[in-house]
């Protein structure tokens, strides 16, 4: 395991929310005492938990495909990868509102393309969400030439996809590249030769869980 993963423990996307509610809480406590302020302290703790972004040890196996998100496996199937135009193995992770919302690179690789698609906001737990919902796809090329596509998909509640990478950049496994507020779904498209290491219904953790292995 590689434990080098510099980043804030609280996702930067949550700093404005946390700062705002913390200031309001202090004002209420100063003006009216703890009896009135305790609900605001509870809300502050909820926001703190909601935007947590804990460090993750990165597995060092060269051929491991790491989970890009915390959540539950909802699909392991052979489909067409519409972003890299190839047949592929798709593994999908559904993220609920209580999961960590950061998205991380599943492999080391160079970003070949970043594609944004407007769309619907149906329940991300449904298969049709993969191609009908608003989404953002990045295609990564490993050093051996194999392609891995990671797609952030919006959902019924999650309507804010953030992606911080662009074509030409190099990502390392476990590197934070995006964020989906209020959870949702991430689809990973792999070469057909990839061997899945997870099953439908299994809970996974971003970076820590190996989704599949490449030949």
From Swiss-Prot:
One cellular component (GO) term of this entry = plasma membrane
Keyword Electron transport recorded = no
Q: Which organism is it from?
A: Ralstonia pickettii (strain 12J)
Tell me the pathway.
Phospholipid metabolism; phosphatidylethanolamine biosynthesis; phosphatidylethanolamine from CDP-diacylglycerol: step 2/2
> How does it sit in the bilayer?
Peripheral membrane protein
Which note does the record give on the cofactor?
Answer: Binds 1 pyruvoyl group covalently per subunit.
Its subcellular locations are:
Cell membrane
Q: What class of enzyme is it?
A: lyase
Keyword Lyase on entry: yes
- What keyword terms does UniProt attach to this protein? Cell membrane, Decarboxylase, Lipid biosynthesis, Lipid metabolism, Lyase, Membrane, Phospholipid biosynthesis, Phospholipid metabolism, Pyruvate, Zymogen
| Matches recorded under HAMAP family | PS_decarb_PSD_A (MF_00664)
The protein, known as? Phosphatidylserine decarboxylase proenzyme
Name the active site residues: 184 (schiff-base intermediate with substrate)
């Amino acid at each position: 395991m590689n434990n080098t993963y510099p980043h804030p423990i609280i996702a930067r996307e949550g700093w404005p929310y946390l700062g705002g509610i913390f200031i309001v809480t202090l004002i209420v406590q100063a003006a009216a005492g703890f009896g009135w302020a305790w609900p605001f302290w509870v809300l502050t703790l909820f926001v703190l938990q909601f935007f947590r972004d804990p460090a993750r040890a990165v597995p060092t196996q060269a051929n491991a495909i790491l989970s890009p998100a915390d959540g539950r496996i909802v699909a392991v199937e052979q489909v067409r990868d519409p972003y890299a135009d190839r047949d592929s193995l798709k593994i999908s992770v559904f993220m609920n509102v209580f999961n960590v919302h950061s998205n991380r690179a599943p492999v080391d690789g160079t970003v070949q393309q970043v594609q944004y698609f407007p769309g619907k906001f149906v329940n991300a737990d449904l298969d049709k969400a993969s191609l009908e919902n608003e989404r953002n796809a990045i295609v990564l090329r490993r050093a051996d030439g194999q392609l891995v596509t990671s797609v952030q998909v919006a959902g019924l509640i999650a309507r804010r996809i953030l992606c911080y990478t662009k074509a030409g950049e190099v990502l390392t496994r476990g590197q934070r590249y995006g964020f989906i507020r209020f959870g949702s779904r991430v689809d990973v498209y792999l070469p057909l030769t990839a061997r899945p290491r997870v099953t439908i219904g299994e809970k996974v953790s971003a970076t820590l869980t190996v989704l599949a292995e490449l030949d």
